[in-house]
Amino acid sequence: MGQKVHPNGMRLGIIKKWNSVWFANTKDFADHLDSDYKVRQFLMKKLVKASVSRIIIERPAKSIRVTIYTARPGIVIGKKGEDVEKLRINIAKITGVPAQINISEVRKPELDAKLVSESITSQLERRVMFRRAMKRSVQNAMRQGAKGIKVEVSGRLGGAEIARREWYREGRVPLHTLRANIDYSISEAHTTYGVIGVKVWIFKGEILGGMSTIEKLEKSSIQIKKQHRKNRK
């Protein structure tokens, strides 16, 4: 029986970047890995309502830099930056080194697999029909410019006695093409009937040129954001 490899893991170093960007010797590696896990768990627990897409952790010269990608930056920052300062202090306590927090806004949450899967799980927990939740997410993603999307739910759908799996796809989702920019995420909906698993694949187009192209795109987006901030001032 054919099994699917994790789409993000397969593309690491080709067109996908790591979520932890640091190098450590053998002595410190386990401690860094453990503190990364604790930081992520802490942030995901604190920022449940902030629609957090991903957390990037860097460790420059005995300090830690955390970049939070979120669809609701206002909730993360808080009134006059109070909330983000509390997060910074807590992260410094967990890791034992000075911490810095950067916040990056996710402009199109409909094209982010993590946010789409969480949206579907929250709808399922509110007893929205699973087919309606799936189709709504697929339509929103295609409207925002996705090349293709596939959504799969599995479990006791609609309270059925026997668990089953259903999926809905629109456009194309080429899982074998390494240059295909596929965003993938998984989440769980805890309903009265049990746990329902949700998987989302979003195909955003092909990236030619590998990691160098990704870095150029990131640099240009940072420059655009800086220019946008200057114009607002």
Curated annotation (Swiss-Prot):
Molecular function terms, GO-annotated: mRNA binding; rRNA binding; structural constituent of ribosome
SUPFAM superfamilies found in the cross-reference section: Prokaryotic type KH domain (KH-domain type II), Ribosomal protein S3 C-terminal domain
GO terms of biological process kind: translation
One family name in Pfam for this protein: KH_2
Domain of life: Bacteria
PROSITE patterns: KH_TYPE_2, RIBOSOMAL_S3
Signal peptide per UniProt: none
S-S pairs: none
Domain KH type-2: 39-107
GO cellular component, one term: cytosolic small ribosomal subunit
CDD domains to which the protein is assigned, alphabetical: KH-II_30S_S3
Self-association and partners: Part of the 30S ribosomal subunit. Forms a tight complex with proteins S10 and S14.
Function as written in the Swiss-Prot or TrEMBL entry: Binds the lower part of the 30S subunit head. Binds mRNA in the 70S ribosome, positioning it for translation.
Protein's recorded name: Small ribosomal subunit protein uS3
Source species taxonomy: Bacteria, Pseudomonadati, Pseudomonadota, Gammaproteobacteria, Enterobacterales
Gene that encodes the chain: rpsC
